[in-house]
Amino acid sequence: MQVDVQNTTVISADGSSIKLGKYSGEVILVVNVASYCGNTAQYEDLQKLHDLYSSKGLRILAFPCNDFGKQEPDSLSEIKDFCTTKYGVEFEIYEKVHAKGNTTEPYTTLNKVEPEGDVEWNFEKFLIGKDSKVIARFKPGVKPFDENLIAAIEVALDS
């Protein structure tokens, strides 16, 4: 089933509701993130992706999540401070979400992507095309510079 996020509403860091359709015409990489996780160092490469591809139309949207091992207990302001201080993060960090069980958007919608089901762990990635349709789902162990992820990003940007 092809999943469309055009009308999916998320909560920004300032508390306002935003439809992901706002990013139509751009490629989006949605990532659930955590500050105290074995995968936290992926922030560094996510920022490098942002540096390399944001001018070409890639938007990285990070959604802090405390569902996995309680690895994101901090407030949003503490999370943002950690990300900017330690990793120089400039991409967008949204309000905390639930990615498994009683999910919140965008995961209520994204968890319908094959293989359907809850996000497995922190730093699972969803690549969304310019048409707001999900192109691919990448498990948490897939690093930001994995050749398959980079290839998918480049194809999406060129489409």
Predicted features along the sequence, with ranges:
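N-terminal "domain-start" segment that seeds a small globular fold
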Residues: 1-21, 41
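Conserved helix-turn-beta segment immediately C-terminal to the redox Cys motif
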Residues: 26-27, 35-36, 40-64, 84-87
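Acidic-and-aromatic substrate-binding clefts and catalytic sites of carbohydrate-active enzymes
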Residues: 37-40, 68-71, 144
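Thiol-based oxidoreductase modules, predominantly thioredoxin-like and allied folds used
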Residues: 57-74, 90-101
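Short, internal strand/loop/helix patches
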Residues: 77-122
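Thiol-/selenol-based redox modules, centered on thioredoxin-like
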Residues: 108-159
